[in-house]
Amino acid sequence: KKLGKKGLTPSKIGIILRDSHGVAQVRFVNGNKILRIMKSVGLKPDIPEDLYHMIKKAVAIRKHLERNRKDKDGKFRLILVESRIHRLARYYKTKSVLPPNWKYESSTASALVA
């Protein structure tokens, strides 16, 4: 709870508990996963962590491409990352983690990760 209130992600909380407190798996100790505990307290993140990091990566590549317009490999990697974002979003919509009207747009992506 305390670490979640500081604004840490579930994976960061797991790393801190593993390294500082010797808790190998929170699930074995508590019976619940970190994200479930955060949900019950009301600290669930808006978008899932893996999707958040994908969007963050796409924003970084897009920023790089603004400075380096001829980077063809960068453009290709951006296409791959964005298609992965769309695939993950579709999965999370079917699992009702994301609302059905949620949509990834490159213009608003930097606001999502800021």
Swiss-Prot record:
Pfam assignment, any one: Ribosomal_S13_N
GO annotations of cellular component type: cytosolic small ribosomal subunit; nucleolus
Any one of the GO BP annotations: translation
Cross-referenced InterPro entries: Ribosomal_uS15 (IPR000589), Ribosomal_uS15_arc_euk (IPR023029), Ribosomal_uS15_N (IPR012606), uS15_NS1_RNA-bd_sf (IPR009068)
Gene3D superfamilies linked to this entry: 4.10.860.130, S15/NS1, RNA-binding (1.10.287.10)
Domain of life: Eukaryota
Family recorded in the similarity comment: Belongs to the universal ribosomal protein uS15 family.
UniProt cross-references to PANTHER family, sorted A to Z: RIBOSOMAL PROTEIN S15P/S13E (PTHR11885), SMALL RIBOSOMAL SUBUNIT PROTEIN US15 (PTHR11885:SF6)
Protein name per its UniProtKB record: Small ribosomal subunit protein uS15
Species classification: Eukaryota, Metazoa, Ecdysozoa, Arthropoda, Hexapoda
